[in-house]
Amino acid sequence: MIIGIAGGSGSGKTYFGHSFLKYLGADNTTLLSQDHYYKGHDGSPLTPEKIQALAQVNYDHPDSLEFKLLASHIQALKNKESIEVPVYDFATHSRLNKTTAANHKPFIVVEGILILSQPNILELLDYSIFVDVPDDKRFQRRLARDQKERGRTVDSVVEQFNKTVN
């Protein structure tokens, strides 16, 4: 069974996905996050200017993601195959030169802001869930997360939220 969880940034998709994992059990559940499928930068040295420019990219637009790869990975898991999930580093806006193995399990949970907008992914899902949370609550959650986990400043989070998220 493949379950898709979508919702705005900071809505609790990842938390909800981990709740499924906990409830259904790690032996029975593969959790796949759209976040791992962001396209990395061009590989040039990361200068402060380059990092600043990358921070201006609209990561909430479908063009920032490799949906074909994500769909092929979901299909592979559905076919009871193993996959190698890319690892994305939000601090450097880059995909790392390593992967994480994921295996087919009875329950596959896929979460991400745009997964329900992609027909090639939507057709693979048995169930879909949309997490709807008020904008002010999502902003509070995103601010806390991005500062703690992604090394962002308050100003950069506010700017990005107002420019590309909200």
Language-model features: locations:
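Small-molecule kinase domains that catalyze NTP-dependent phosphoryl transfer to phosphate-bearing small molecules
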Residues: 148-166
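Hydrophobic positions on the alpha1 helix immediately C-terminal to the Walker A/P-loop
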Residues: 16, 20
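Conserved nucleotide-sensing/catalytic segment adjacent to the nucleotide-binding pocket
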Residues: 27-33, 39-90
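ATP-dependent NMP and nucleoside kinases share a basic, alpha-helical "lid"
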Residues: 96-150
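The conserved Walker
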Residues: 9
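Short gly/ser/thr-rich secondary-structure transition/capping motifs
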Residues: 87-96, 108-113, 163-166
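Short hydrophobic/aromatic beta-strand immediately N-terminal to the Walker A/P-loop
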Residues: 2-4
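Conserved lysine of the Walker
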Residues: 13
